[in-house]
Amino acid sequence: MASNSSSCPTPGGGHLNGYPVPPYAFFFPPMLGGLSPPGALTSLQHQLPVSGYSTPSPATIETQSSSSEEIVPSPPSPPPLPRIYKPCFVCQDKSSGYHYGVSACEGCKGFFRRSIQKNMVYTCHRDKNCIINKVTRNRCQYCRLQKCFDVGMSKESVRNDRNKKKKEAPKPECSESYTLTPEVGELIEKVRKAHQETFPALCQLGKYTTNNSSEQRVSLDIDLWDKFSELSTKCIIKTVEFAKQLPGFTTLTIADQITLLKAACLDILILRICTRYTPEQDTMTFSDGLTLNRTQMHNAGFGPLTDLVFAFANQLLPLEMDDAETGLLSAICLICGDRQDLEQPDKVDMLQEPLLEALKVYVRKRRPSRPHMFPKMLMKITDLRSISAKGAERVITLKMEIPGSMPPLIQEMLENSEGLDTLSGQSGGGTRDGGGLAPPPGSCSPSLSPSSHRSSPATQSP
C-alpha cells in the first residue's frame, strides 16, 4: 500500500531502516512502489520480481545492505493547486489574500489600514448608500469604509498588526551607503526652494468651494472652464519660473528650453495638482484655494481624463512625497534627454544625472528601511507621460467644446514642437500679455521663452 506522499521524508543519500537509498531529484518526496503488507513479505522473498525489482523483507534489508538492486521510485505527486481566493469582499476586484479578517484586494486592504491608523473621518455627498465596486470604489471613501466594516474587516486586526511591527527588530539597512555630500545637499535645497516659491503647499491655502455642477457630470461647465483655464495659464507661467531656477537649465539653447518645457509642462501640471489631492473629500485644490470635487473637475474640462488623474493622485499617497521629492521629480521630468528635436540631448542628460543622484540619495536617506521607494517614484514618470498623452488628446476635443478660442498660452504650450514655425509665423500670434512679437528665424514664440518677463511674482498657479 502506497503511503501518503505529503508525510514522507524526502530521500537523500543515506539509509532508510538500514537499506541504502539513492538520492532523487524530485521536488516532492517520491513514493516507493511495490511495498507489500508486512505479513506477505516472507512468502514473496523468493519469487521473481513482478515489476523488475524485488521487494526485500526487513530481514533481507539487514543482510543485503551491499546489494546492487535498485529501488525504483513511483512518479512524484502532482504539485498542489494554487490557492484561489474569493473576490475582494469590498469591491469584487481580484483578491490578494485574507486581510483583516476577509478576502480583500491590495487596494481595499491599504485603504482600510490607512483609514484606521490615521482615524480618517469621511463624508458621503449622496445618500450614504453608494455602490462600491472595482470602478467606483475611489469615488466615495465614506461608503467604501462602511462596506469594509459591513463585510467584516476588523479594526483590532489593524491595531494588532501595527503593534506587531513596532515590536519587530528593525531590518538591517541597505548595505549600499548613500552620503549626502555638500554639493548634493545644495542641489536639493535649490530645487526645493524653486518648487516652494512657484507652488504653495496645500496647508498654506485658504480653501473655498463652489456649487457649480457639483452633483452631475456634464460635457462642459463654461463657468468652471473659464476659471480652470485662467488658473492653468498661471500655472504654466509658474512652471516656466520653476524651470529657470533649476541649475543649468538656462545654459541650454533657447530652442531646447522651449522643447523641454512644451514636452514636460503637462506632466508637471498633473503631478502638482495631484499633490493637492484630499482623499477624505475626493477633491483637488488650486493655488487660489478653489477646491473642486471629482464631478466638478470633469465638468471644468478634464472630461474623460478625470478618473485617470484621480487614480494617479491616489497612487501618490503611499509615497508620502515632500516638497524636495516633488520638486526633484518635476525637474527630472523636465530635464530629460530623450525628448524629440533637442539640439543638445547629451547636455540635457548631463544636467539630469545629478538630479537623479540627488533624488536617490535623498529618498534613501529619508527612508533607510525602504530602498524600493526610489524606483517606485521614478516609475511615476512613466505614468505621468501616459496621462499627458491622453491630456494632449483632450485639448484637441476641448477646442470643439468651448465657445471661444483656447487660451493662447495653453494652446502654445501643448502644441507639438514641430508646430513652432507655424505658430511663430502667424500674424497677431502674440499672447494676452506678450504682444505680437515676431521671433527671429529658428527661435520660438516669445510667450514661451524662459527669458520672457511675462510672469509676475504675485501670480499664482493651480
Curated annotation (Swiss-Prot):
GO process terms (BP): apoptotic cell clearance; bone development; cellular response to estrogen stimulus; cellular response to lipopolysaccharide; cellular response to retinoic acid; chondroblast differentiation; embryonic camera-type eye development; face development
Effect seen on changing residue 391 to A: In embryonal carcinoma cell line RAC65
GO (cellular component) term, any one: transcription regulator complex
PTMs per UniProt: Phosphorylated on serine and threonine residues. Phosphorylation does not change during cell cycle. Phosphorylation on Ser-77 is crucial for the N-terminal AF1 transcriptional activity. Under stress conditions, MAPK8 enhances phosphorylation on Thr-181, Ser-445 and Ser-461 leading to RARA ubiquitination and degradation. Phosphorylation by AKT1 inhibits the transactivation activity. On retinoic acid stimulation, phosphorylation on Ser-369 by RPS6KA5 promotes interaction with GTF2H3 and the CDK7-mediated phosphorylation of Ser-77.
Modified residues (N6,N6,N6-trimethyllysine): 347
Amino acid composition bias (Low complexity), ranges on this chain: 444-462
Residue ranges: DNA binding: 88-153
Annotated region (Disordered), positions in chain: 52-77, 420-462
UniProt record similarity statement: Belongs to the nuclear hormone receptor family. NR1 subfamily.
Protein name: Retinoic acid receptor alpha
Organism (species): Mus musculus (Mouse)
UniProt lineage: Eukaryota, Metazoa, Chordata, Craniata, Vertebrata
